[in-house]
């Protein structure tokens, strides 16, 4: 087969410029170090391609295989891996330093829904003016908030003052 690589990640057939290459047969056996022209003939006889697997090695390692099938398998694996990846969103719940108990209850119910859905939750208590002097109140609010939802979430990053906000990140509990 006379396939010229459209895939820039691999060097195939006549694109291999080295004089000698280490060849692995289509069955996985080592054929040793042979001239590139001879390796190309071997691949052509079997109606397969010579693909440089490690072009930077000395001598380069090449494998006799069906390149089209190989590329198809690679893209199939990539799609499968991409499909199995779970994208974790971070939802934010904002509280104020002077929040009332009922409002904390409503916000914690929203955070509970996010955690059950599998999202992480960033809980931020915003301080205005001189309220940062009373950061302990913010920590109390966050502790109270966490007590309401500790059955569905765990603290990933404990409460910490960042500028005028005290932030805590919660993650869903593992089942």
From Swiss-Prot:
Chief site of localization: cytoplasm
Keyword Lipoprotein (UniProt): no
Gene Ontology biological process terms from the UniProt entry: ribosome disassembly
Annotated Gene Ontology cellular component terms: cytosol; membrane
Domain of life: Bacteria
Positions of disulphide bridges: none
UniProt subcellular location: Cytoplasm
PROSITE patterns with a match to the protein in the record: IF3 (PS00938)
General function of this protein: IF-3 binds to the 30S ribosomal subunit and shifts the equilibrium between 70S ribosomes and their 50S and 30S subunits in favor of the free subunits, thus enhancing the availability of 30S subunits on which protein synthesis initiation begins.
Name this polypeptide is given: Translation initiation factor IF-3
Taxonomic source organism: Clostridium acetobutylicum (strain ATCC 824 / DSM 792 / JCM 1419 / IAM 19013 / LMG 5710 / NBRC 13948 / NRRL B-527 / VKM B-1787 / 2291 / W)
Lineage, top ranks: Bacteria, Bacillati, Bacillota, Clostridia, Eubacteriales
């Amino acid at each position: 087969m006379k396939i010229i690589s459209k895939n820039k990640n691999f060097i195939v057939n006549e694109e291999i410029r080295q004089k000698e290459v280490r060849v692995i047969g289509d069955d996985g056996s080592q054929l040793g170090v042979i001239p590139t022209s001879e390796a190309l003939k071997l691949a052509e006889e079997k109606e397969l391609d010579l693909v440089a697997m490690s072009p930077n090695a000395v001598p380069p390692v090449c494998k006799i295989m069906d390149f089209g099938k190989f590329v198809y398998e690679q893209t199939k694996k990539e799609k499968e891996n991409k499909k199995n990846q779970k994208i974790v969103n971070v939802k934010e719940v904002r509280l104020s330093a002077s929040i009332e108990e009922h409002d904390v209850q409503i916000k914690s119910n929203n955070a509970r829904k996010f955690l059950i859905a599998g999202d992480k939750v960033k809980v931020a208590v915003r301080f205005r003016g001189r309220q940062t002097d009373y950061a302990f109140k913010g920590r109390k609010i966050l502790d109270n908030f966490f007590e309401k939802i500790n059955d569905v979430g765990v603290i990933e990053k404990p409460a910490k003052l960042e500028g005028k906000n005290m932030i805590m990140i919660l993650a869903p509990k593992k089942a």
